[in-house]
UniProtKB/Swiss-Prot annotation:
DNA-binding region: 112-180, 196-264, 298-362, 400-467, 486-552
GO cellular component labels: nucleolus; nucleus
Keyword entries, A-Z: Activator, DNA-binding, Nucleus, Repeat, Transcription, Transcription regulation
Pfam families: HMG_box, HMG_box_2, HMG_box_5
Bias type Low complexity, positions: 659-671
Single GO BP term: positive regulation of transcription by RNA polymerase I
Organism of origin: Xenopus laevis
Gene from which the chain derives: ubtf-a
Protein name: Nucleolar transcription factor 1-A
Region ranges (Disordered): 1-21, 182-201, 376-404, 557-677
Domain of life (superkingdom): Eukaryota
Amino acid sequence: MNGAAGGVTQAKMTAPKDQDPWSQDEMLTLIQTMKTLLPSQDNSKFKTTESHLDWNKLAFKNYSGSMCRQKWMEISNEVRKFRTLSELILDAEEHVRHPYKGKKLKKHPEFPKKPLTPYFRFFMEKRAKYAKLHPEMSNLDLTKILSKKYKELPEKKKMKYIQDFQREKLEFERNLARFREEHPDLMQNPKKSDVPEKPKTPQQLWYNHERKVYLKLHADASTKDVKDALGKQWSQLTDKKRLKWIHKALEQRKQYEGIMREYMQKHPELNIAEEGITRSTLTKAERQLKDKFDGRPTKPPPNSYSMYCAELMANMKDVPSTERMVLCSQRWKLLSQKEKDAYNKKCEQRKKDYEVELMRFLESLPEEEQQRVLAEEKMVRSRSGQADKKKAADERAKLPETPKTAEEIWQQSVIGDYLARFKNDRAKALKSMEGTWLNMEKKEKIMWIKKAAEDQKRYERELSDMRATPTPTTAGKKVKFLGEPKKAPMNGYQKFSQELLSNGELNHLPLKERMVEIGSRWHRISPSQKDYYKKLAEDQQRVYRTQFDTWMKGLSSQDRAAYKEQNSNKRKSTAKIQVPVAKPKLVAQSKSDDDDEDDDDDEDEDDDDDEDEDKEDSSEDGDSSESSSDEDSEDGEENEDEEGEEDEDEEEDDDDNESGSSSSSSSSADSSDSDSN
């Protein structure tokens, strides 16, 4: 029997095969940590306390919270959970010696009697009288009547009960102090946890302060009375008063962080998470209020339509919210293109002003707060990167509005009536309109067909105007087309550069130094490695050409014309720009090796900017935004122009695949090859 029991014990204490066995020190560490998490007055059943433990706080080393719990179950299974008579007798002996220790202290015959509150004094005085007057009433009904009578008492009569209470309270406090001196063994407070108290929210700080003030004026008030009196006052406080408590809460949280970090150093075994220390005590509304008073600018509407709706809704407060949106949509559609353009221009100006004000606000903040605001704004680390993205969005917005069909123009004119008929159910309204249009006679459709033809002419006219007089931004900056495949590197050197730039290995270096480092690394690699990168670039070029052909075939005739027009304009502009001009930094250099290396740098800047252009439409914000300086963006635009030519002329792609996208890139690759050889 004993052998079998010993086998069971060993099996329980042994860890499963898929985890490391626990050492004795580790098990003792687990038990010691559990001790620190026990409540100060642990009077519940062990199962109850065990179920309330936060096992994630017990995690340490490679052991998770669930693993710690499993190990505790194994250990506790080996410990008896009943008490012997010997142990019970020890507790009984302690109870006989100190019968009033703990919760029974107030039953001690010498413990001073607590004074009655003013209300209870009134209640005890009047209860017998009212019970005789209303014998049919229950105790509950009598209490309700007397409570109401006490509240209706004039302050002068109430003051009598309050003064009696305060006099007896002072006497009680004196007697309690004497009792503590005479019975120090009974007054020993249980050892409290040394974990620092968590910081309070602004509302909690305000409530504690107001509670003390309220109790001074209403000494007889119960906890419920205080809560009822103060419950709604916080929401009615002015912003200025609420801000006072927000500042106090922030100060308290800062002090808590410092104390808690010292505590963590003294108790590393507790494994306290950093998030628990730095968690904000402010709500979102309180944070916004503080930022507003600190000078944070209000974010403008994201687009011209939202701005129009915001202005319109300010004068439509009596209209239900569902109808407001319908009315906004209808009125927006009735605006002329000139009016819409004016709103668009106004919106863009507000965004520019907002960016300037936000940067000014950020400069006034400490670094920690700057990071928080930047995270909230979803801005990239480099501020100029956002400006580049905004410019690209501007160019997309400047394309002419696509022409509408006859059915779309008709639907736009009658949508309000159909929505009213179907109680704002858009799906039903659209379905009904489609049926009506199909059953409409040709004579009725002629007017809408003519309007559609006029809209088509308008689109072609605006498109031709845009082509004839391209703005500086459209001429110099490429407009992104939806679904356009990302360009592949033109040669081995570009592929090598992209790889180093994308893996983040050189992110600690400034852009110029990054390019120099890439050039020197390219010189150092072997010819076989260069051939490897060259082959990778060729493979990617083949895949890119296939994707590009498929994408071009999927474009509408209008989009294809716009794309070709854009590339032809870029060729004209780059033909004027691409005049060989020596950079100032090259004048003082005489060695050919240094010239080649600078060419490599320029080419890499092109690659880096090209990557930035491609990343502008993605949702991720990365380090590529650092390459948005004026000189680099110009180089990137030239590189894009030349690649755009090759997209249009596939035969040139085949010829230039090995040599590169520009004279600078080919010369850098050739010179670097020759140097390595």
